[in-house]
């Protein structure tokens, strides 16, 4: 089962947290639609800013958005001008008070979304898929990953028939729930059509903290 299921969804509540931190009964559909609009808007607006994840929290008429990016300077802008413009645009989009928090990604080579985007951009630039995948995987392993697996599907190198090619280095234990595995799917748009790029990165194990018992010895 671990081979088929989304590794992030499988680990939510165990070693991963939700990217949307709110609860609603009557307004659930409206909030979910708004979340999708926010994520789509940020993805288009900050397409060159290496944005990995967007976390959304809600409280009354306020929306707190945490943007995880490898290029915080590009998102913030000179004197905070860019992030202020983004906040105003999101205010108009949602009709709510929006607060934006920028979180820097210290090691972009260990982030599955950014690694996948890197491979996708190379494929769009007509780099051979094997070269793009292997070069990126070696850089990720040098950055401290325990293992990485990449998969590209579509009309590779402009072939008439679409196929799937995958490569792996190190270990990627998909069944181990305490294994910190980052997963992402990215699309590359080439002259021959769209290619799907999947990335799994194993960053080590996250062990649950042992609870200390305050009980005294004896019966």
UniProtKB/Swiss-Prot annotation:
SMART domains per the UniProt record, alphabetical: KH
Gene Ontology molecular functions: mRNA binding; rRNA binding; structural constituent of ribosome
Domain KH type-2: 38-106
Gene Ontology CC annotations of this record: cytosolic small ribosomal subunit
Pfam families in UniProt: KH_2, Ribosomal_S3_C
Keywords noted in UniProt: Ribonucleoprotein, Ribosomal protein, RNA-binding, rRNA-binding
Swiss-Prot/TrEMBL GO biological process terms: translation
The UniProt record lists the keyword Lipid biosynthesis: no
Physiological role: Binds the lower part of the 30S subunit head. Binds mRNA in the 70S ribosome, positioning it for translation.
PANTHER family reported in the protein's UniProt record: 30S/40S RIBOSOMAL PROTEIN S3, SMALL RIBOSOMAL SUBUNIT PROTEIN US3C
Family recorded in the similarity comment: Belongs to the universal ribosomal protein uS3 family.
Subunit structure: Part of the 30S ribosomal subunit. Forms a tight complex with proteins S10 and S14.
Protein name, as recorded: Small ribosomal subunit protein uS3
Species lineage: Bacteria, Bacillati, Bacillota, Bacilli, Lactobacillales
Name of the gene this protein is made from: rpsC
């Amino acid at each position: 089962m671990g081979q088929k299921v989304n590794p992030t969804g499988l680990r939510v509540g165990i070693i991963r947290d939700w990217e949307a931190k709110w609860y609603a009964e009557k307004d659930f559909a409206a909030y979910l639609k708004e979340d999708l609009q926010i994520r789509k808007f940020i993805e288009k607006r900050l397409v060159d800013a290496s944005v990995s994840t967007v976390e959304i929290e809600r409280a009354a008429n306020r929306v707190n958005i945490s943007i995880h990016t490898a290029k915080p300077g590009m998102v913030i802008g000179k004197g905070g001008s860019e992030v202020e413009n983004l906040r105003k645009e999101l205010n108009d989009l949602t009709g709510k008070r929006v607060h934006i928090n920028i979180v820097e990604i210290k090691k972009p080579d260990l982030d599955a979304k950014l690694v996948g985007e890197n491979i996708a951009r190379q494929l769009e630039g007509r780099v051979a898929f094997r070269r793009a995948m292997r070069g990126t995987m070696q850089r990720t392993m040098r950055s401290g990953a325990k293992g990485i697996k990449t998969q590209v599907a579509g009309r590779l190198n402009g072939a008439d028939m679409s196929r799937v090619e995958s490569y792996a280095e190190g270990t990627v234990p998909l069944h181990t729930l305490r294994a910190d595995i980052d997963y992402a799917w990215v699309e590359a748009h080439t002259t021959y059509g769209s290619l799907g790029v999947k990335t799994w990165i194993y960053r080590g194990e996250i062990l649950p903290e042992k609870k200390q018992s305050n009980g005294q010895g004896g019966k």
